[in-house]
Each structure stands twice: as C-alpha cells, then as structure tokens.
A protein has these predicted regions:
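Acidic, turn-prone loop/beta-hairpin segments
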Residues: 1-31, 60-150, 154
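Short helix-adjacent coil turns
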Residues: 34-41
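Hydrophobic residues within the alpha-helices of tandem HEAT/HEAT-like
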Residues: 50-51
C-alpha cells in the first residue's frame, strides 16, 4: 500500500539517512554541473551514485529488510527510501537520458500514483534539502566502504 505516510526522519535507520544524505548531495552536485553546462560530470555523478552506493551498498546491505515478513516500520522505511532514490535519480537523469528516465519514472509512478504527471519531463526537478545532508555520516560510511574494499582485495 503506497498510501502510508512517510516514516519520520528521526525514526529511519542510519543506513537510510546515509543514502538519503548522499542523494541530497547528489542533487546539489548535479544541479551545479548542469548549471555549469557540464552534462558529462552530471551523468558520471548519477552513475557513480547508482552503481557504487545505491546498488552495491544500500540494496545489498538491506536485503533482509526488503524481504522480511510483514510490513514493519523498518521495512516501510527501506521501501520508501529506495523509492525516493529511484524517483529522484529518474528526474536527475532526464536531461541526459530522456527516454530511459521517462520509462523508469512512469514505471514507478504507475504503481504508486505519487505523481500525477504524464512524463518525468513535466515533473519538477529535484531540490536538495540541506538539512538532510550529513557529511559526517557520509564520510564514516565511505571509510567503512574503503576498509571493506581493502579487505576484499586481499
């Protein structure tokens, strides 16, 4: 059921706050790159976020939360966080990969009904929320990722 209210920020686990912090940092960076007419840098930043952080870390570390039984607040938070990331990424990449972004966006909103627009190109471009950016948390997680990568490389 996609009508559940969003889980409060303070009740979200640290891993959700981390990926949403990175997402807000990404929105800020991509907006700056596009304003500076640097679409290649914007595209690379989006790709790095999706591949390195969303897919390789967030989704992998949260498999149990996604597949656990029952719809707990923790599971709802995980689903809402992932949905927010995917919807925002679709909007961010719309100027760079218009057809793919539109298909991703339409597939998401067809299920949830959260946006009443016919295309990602008719939706508002994301605006970052500075209060959701936690550079300390981002740095701590980056350190954990670096250590994990070093151990795996041995």
């Amino acid at each position: 059921d996609y009508s559940d209210p969003d889980v409060e920020w303070s009740k979200r686990p640290e891993i959700d706050r981390w990926i949403l912090s990175l997402l807000n940092s990404l929105v800020k960076d991509v907006d700056g790159y596009l304003e500076a007419y640097e679409p290649t840098r914007a595209g690379r930043a989006i790709s790095d976020f999706v591949n390195d952080n969303l897919s390789n870390w967030y989704v992998r570390l949260n498999r149990r939360r996604f597949w656990g039984g029952g719809m707990t607040e923790d599971k709802l938070s995980a689903y809402q966080t992932l949905y927010t990331c995917l919807e925002t990424v679709a909007k961010l990449m719309a100027p760079i990969a218009p057809f793919y972004a539109d298909q991703l966006f339409l597939d998401l909103v067809a299920v949830t009904g959260r946006e009443n627009v016919e295309s990602v190109h008719l939706s508002d471009f994301p605006v970052y929320d500075e209060s959701k950016i936690d550079k300390n948390l981002e740095e701590r997680m980056q350190m954990a990722q670096d250590v994990s990568s070093m151990v795996a490389a041995r």
